[in-house]
């Protein structure tokens, strides 16, 4: 049996990767990937943090951010679930738009100039399947492209191009990204490996780190057990850094009793404890409200109202805690859902899968206010009418990458595959990153010059091999191998080759080096000459 199969089939991952913080267990993604071999795959040096909140199921943005200026159109389209105009929460300096009455926390953040509402975010030719639409948002792809990498994973691979070789190191001793949840997110998938780790189900702390172990027998099964123990040992070393950071925060502000709040409390604790982790992902489910979205007697309460209460109170508590922990200058957050809901409600007091919906950007360094206009709605909306998108969701991504993480225009095109408009949603003065430190950290095994390059350029690929079979592949944005410039036996040393890029379309590519157990992927960008 192969080691990866033994690992996968012998005991649950949660049993291999022990608990570390607030009763949540930790595991690395991709049990059979190179990430597993390096397991100490941490990472970061910047002080800027992005917290991504996924609202699973397709949130009804029209009942969350309510168009007061077109209240009659809104009410007529959904008379059985519409929020009474008198109960809509007002926003300072804006008489056109309001919030669901259960979102007093978000109202406070808006009035305190710590919230930006981006109206009608979507993309062309929207998909209404939960799974496919989620993949589109996670990958940052066009609706007709099946991209196998995530937008944050590609970003992290450009920011930390040597990862995971030579990690952890003094520049970035911590995870690049942390997701709270048991399912690995496509958003964190890099060109070759997942760039994050997850904190998952509640269990005991470090049950493997300090446990007493019997000697390993000198048998094939014993050798596999030794391999598992070695992986567990490396994982515990990595988890130890997280536990140390969490242990430095002994007091936090109050949080409400809901699952999203529990996740955000962990995030605040880890940031406050000094982790340099760049991106955190959390999620909250239940937003697929086809029926019983509201109570018949009172549309301000019901299933959707409960969800919005949990989101609002959790985010407000998180921001209060960030201020208390003196980390609010470092943190911004965003919400997204795989799609919105239809303009017109259905006969079951619910809403069906729709297109565009608003996003929340929150934090001390977001530009406060409302980006865009209230969504346009036809006078007599029918069951097939959708809210048209005003902003492509990748414009929001691009704005965060450019203005919060200081990503260059060339790297933006590599990450998002094309240019998208920059929105005034982040304070420009926030961009103070240390990109050279990040990009020089770790061991550089492969590089290209020039990069970006044109059809007429002579591209040189330099690489280091420890000897033996060495493979270099050039992969396009869809994950297809389009060139194999190196596939041969080499002796230990440094080498240079000329890469023939003739005939390749303009766009983002990745050069992947594989040499034994070593693997490294670097982004490439071909531009029009």
What kind of feature is each model-predicted range?
Residues 428-442:
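Low-complexity, Pro/Thr/Ser/Gly/Ala-rich linker/spacer regions in secreted
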Residues 1-313, 317-325, 344, 358-431:
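Feature for exported/extracytoplasmic and membrane-associated proteins, marking the mature portion
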Residues 282, 338, 451:
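Conserved hydrophobic/aromatic pocket- or pore-lining residues that grip, position, or stack substrates
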Residues 277-279, 328, 336, 354-357, ...:
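Active-site lining segments that contact anionic ligands and/or coordinate catalytic metals
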Residues 440-449, 454-529:
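C-terminal outer-membrane/trafficking sorting elements
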Residues 321-329, 333-352, 360:
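Hydrophobic alpha-helical bundle architecture
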């Amino acid at each position: 049996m192969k080691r990866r199969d033994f690992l996968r089939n012998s005991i649950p991952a949660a049993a291999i990767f022990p608990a570390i913080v607030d009763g949540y267990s930790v595991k690395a993604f991709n049990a059979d990937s190179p990430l597993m071999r390096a397991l100490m795959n941490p990472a970061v040096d910047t002080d800027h943090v992005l917290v991504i909140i996924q609202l699973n199921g397709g949130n009804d943005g029209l009942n969350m951010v309510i168009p007061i200026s077109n209240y009659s159109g809104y009410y007529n389209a959904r008379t059985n679930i519409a929020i009474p105009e008198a109960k809509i929460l007002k926003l300072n300096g804006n008489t056109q738009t309001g919030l669901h009455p259960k979102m007093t926390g978000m109202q406070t953040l808006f009035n305190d100039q710590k919230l930006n509402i981006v109206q009608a975010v979507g993309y062309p030719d929207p998909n209404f399947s939960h799974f496919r639409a989620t993949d589109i948002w996670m990958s940052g792809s066009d609706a007709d492209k099946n991209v196998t990498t995530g937008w944050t994973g590609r970003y992290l691979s450009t920011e930390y191009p040597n990862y995971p070789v030579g990690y952890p190191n003094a520049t970035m001793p911590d995870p690049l990204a942390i997701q709270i949840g048991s399912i690995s997110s496509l958003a964190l998938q890099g060109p070759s490996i997942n760039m994050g780790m997850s904190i998952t189900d509640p269990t005991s702390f470090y049950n493997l780190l300090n446990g007493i172990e019997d000697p390993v027998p000198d048998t094939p099964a014993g050798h596999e057990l030794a391999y598992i123990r070695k992986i567990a040992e490396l994982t515990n070393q990595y988890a130890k850094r997280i536990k140390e950071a969490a242990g430095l925060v002994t007091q936090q502000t109050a949080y409400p009793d809901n699952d999203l709040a529990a996740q955000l409390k962990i995030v605040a604790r880890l940031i406050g404890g000094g982790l340099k982790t760049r991106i955190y992902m959390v999620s909250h489910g239940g937003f697929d409200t086809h029926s019983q979205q509201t109570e018949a007697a009172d549309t301000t309460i019901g299933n959707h109202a409960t969800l919005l209460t949990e989101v609002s109170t959790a985010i407000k508590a998180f921001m209060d805690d960030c201020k208390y922990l003196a980390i609010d200058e470092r943190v911004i957050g965003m919400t997204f859902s795989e799609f919105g809901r239809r303009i017109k409600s259905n006969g079951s007091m619910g809403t069906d899968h729709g297109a565009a919906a608003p996003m929340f950007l929150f934090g001390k360094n977001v530009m406060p206010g409302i980006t865009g206009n209230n969504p346009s709605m036809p006078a007599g909306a029918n069951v097939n009418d959708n809210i048209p998108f005003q902003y492509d969701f990748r414009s929001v991504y691009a704005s965060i990458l450019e203005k919060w993480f200081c990503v260059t225009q060339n790297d933006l095109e590599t990450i998002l595959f094309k240019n998208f408009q920059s929105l005034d949603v982040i304070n420009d003065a926030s961009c103070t990153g240390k990109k050279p430190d990040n990009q020089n950290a770790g061991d550089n095994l492969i590089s290209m010059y020039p990069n970006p390059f044109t059809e007429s350029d002579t591209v040189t690929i330099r690489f280091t091999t420890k000897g033996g079979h060495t493979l270099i592949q050039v992969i396009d944005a869809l994950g297809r191998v389009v060139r194999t410039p190196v596939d041969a036996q080499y002796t230990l040393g440094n080498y240079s080759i000329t890469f023939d890029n003739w005939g390749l379309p303009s766009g983002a590519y990745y050069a992947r080096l594989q040499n034994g157990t070593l693997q490294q992927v670097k982004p490439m960008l071909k531009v029009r000459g």
